[in-house]
Amino acid sequence: MAQAQPGAAVAATKLPALSHLPNPSPLMKRLGAPLLALPAYQTGTAFADAPPAFTEVGLRYTHYSEDSIDQDVVIFGATDRYDIDVTQLWIEAPVGASWSVALDVQNDYQTGASPWFVGAQQDGAPGVIMSGASIQDNRVEVGVTTRYFWADGNAGVAVSHSDEDDYEATALAFDASWNSADDARTWSTSFSSSRDTLNPTQGVIPVFVTEEDLDTQSGYFGVSQILSRTAIARIGLSYTLSEGYLSDPYKFRDQRPDSHERLSLSAGYRRFLIDSDASLQIDYRYYADSWGTDSHTVEVAWAQNLPGSLLTPYLRYYTQREADFFGVIADTDAQYYADDYRLSSYGAVTLGARWAVDLGESWTLELEAERYMTDADWGVFDGGAAPALVDFWRGTVGIIWRFD
């Protein structure tokens, strides 16, 4: 789980931590960061070396709904795409003066159809053959985190296990943060390892894989620095290596390398504006991998304090270069090939807002709404236009209870 850094008050708010599961299941991979967010514990102002001051219990529900695919690009199959319901329950509590323990339980239920492969229509334009609307999947993840706090920092160990109809994953993670002598700077590091096992289920789509494994290791190092009474900046570098089965067994033309290296550089800036009683939040991320893909993400948010609540509208832009082996219509004569739109060149814009409302001293209501839109022409990289790019809506409601 994420820990607030010294001087975090200048940020006015704190985003949820990313899931401690380093290699999400195929169901969650398609969602990206939005639904990989797990609870942000103890969201009040805190220092990296401060244990939680109270017990926190939270319940959150998220609904994710993809727009139907344009009938003009469908050769065969249903036009409805995925709907996913995510329910999260968590509890974190102090244990003694220097420890805390947290339990996370998450359930995801998915229904709908997805692209099976891309072929040529009668006029030669690319068209999509869909899987049919009969896909259903349910995933349950349970995670436990224990954390130790000392005078200048903290360290935590997390273990998680997730299971669904065709996928099982176990992950172990370690993280630590420590402060400089003047508490103006905080260093953070984390390491994680996961073992995933895939057992594809036979259905409407023929599957030619019985059982495959995937191992993933990931490391991160970052630093945050208080720049002034009202400003803080951070920078971080992460590296991830996955080895094993990385193709998508539910796609007809998909043969990917059995190794995938990823490198990302992230930076952020928070400035509290006293006169406005709000903070400006700017985040940037550069990503590159061994498949030839690289991407840029920029997010700008405005966290506005209101009477009894905090409202944070945000705008995010994403652009991606296509993988070396991507083709709008896959070239099956090549060693590696894929027509998965997620490996294509495109751009995406996200508009959203988060609203946290205090309901008395012990309760907080969380609301969030987001619209995600993609287009091949919105990206800055050249490449073929995949016909199955996805747009979606996402809505979240949550309630948090804190008590001594």
Give the role of each language-model region.
Residues 81, 136-138, 161-171, 259, ...:
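Solvent-exposed loop/turn segments connecting transmembrane beta-strands
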Residues 51-57, 87, 97-101, 140, ...:
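Outer-envelope beta-barrel architecture signal
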Residues 89-93, 144-148, 174-178, 221-225, ...:
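Residues on the lipid-exposed face of transmembrane beta-strands in outer-membrane beta-barrel proteins
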Residues 389-404:
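Outer-membrane beta-barrel "beta-signal"
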